[in-house]
């Protein structure tokens, strides 16, 4: 789905596709690999109280393992986009972008989603007038969004789902954006009676122990 989402965004520029991409990245791709023994799995149960069954490194190998490894290369794939004289920040992920056409480097520093902010530092060979736009995600509290440039409050224009700051940028300029998250109940896409609780783009889950969680790791019959 992320491949399709990527192509639809590149064709339309619709920010809504990046909302979906972000949600899938954090809640599906990130959790598709077991953090302890490295097993992989695609299937993500939507039913309350259910769990995943991961592969085991030495006894299981199926499509979830082979193509599942590729998924984790997507963390850096859609962080940025660009138009003429405009850099677009779609994902709030620590990263470094070298924009060779403009002789500029952008360093994004963030602990999102643990902290509700991100910081972008620009390095450039010479001053450059251009736009820097940040995605306005569906989950954000717009009334509390704030920007600062070099520590001073800055105004950003919200257009077509993006906050934009346009100015003449100097080497070392830094942009800070607050990312105020909200807690909400979201009905599942099938319009069933099931809801997920989300904080920002993150689906919340509770540790319910391991009772009756048999077969969390697949055996060699699969």
Where are these regions (language model features)?
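Short, flexible surface segments
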Residues: 141, 171-172, 199
């Amino acid at each position: 789905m992320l491949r399709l989402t990527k192509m639809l965004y590149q064709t339309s520029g619709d920010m809504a596709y990046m909302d979906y991409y972000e949600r899938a990245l954090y809640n599906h791709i990130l959790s598709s690999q077991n953090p302890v023994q490295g097993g992989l799995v695609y299937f993500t149960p939507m039913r309350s109280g259910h769990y995943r069954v991961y592969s085991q490194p030495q006894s299981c190998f199926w499509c979830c393992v082979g193509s599942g490894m590729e998924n984790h290369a997507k963390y850096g794939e859609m962080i940025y986009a660009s138009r003429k004289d405009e850099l677009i920040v779609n994902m709030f992920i620590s990263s470094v972008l070298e924009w060779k056409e403009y002789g500029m480097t952008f360093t994004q520093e963030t602990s999102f989603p643990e902290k509700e902010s991100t910081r972008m530092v620009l390095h450039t060979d010479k001053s450059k007038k251009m736009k820097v736009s940040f995605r306005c995600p569906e989950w954000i509290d717009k009334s509390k969004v704030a920007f600062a440039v070099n520590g001073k409050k800055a105004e950003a224009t919200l257009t077509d789902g993006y906050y934009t700051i346009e100015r003449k940028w100097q080497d070392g300029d830094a942009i800070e954006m607050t990312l105020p998250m909200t807690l909400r109940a979201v009905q599942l896409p099938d319009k069933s009676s099931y809801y997920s609780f989300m904080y920002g783009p993150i689906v919340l889950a509770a540790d319910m122990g391991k009772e009756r969680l048999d077969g969390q790791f697949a055996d060699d019959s699969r």
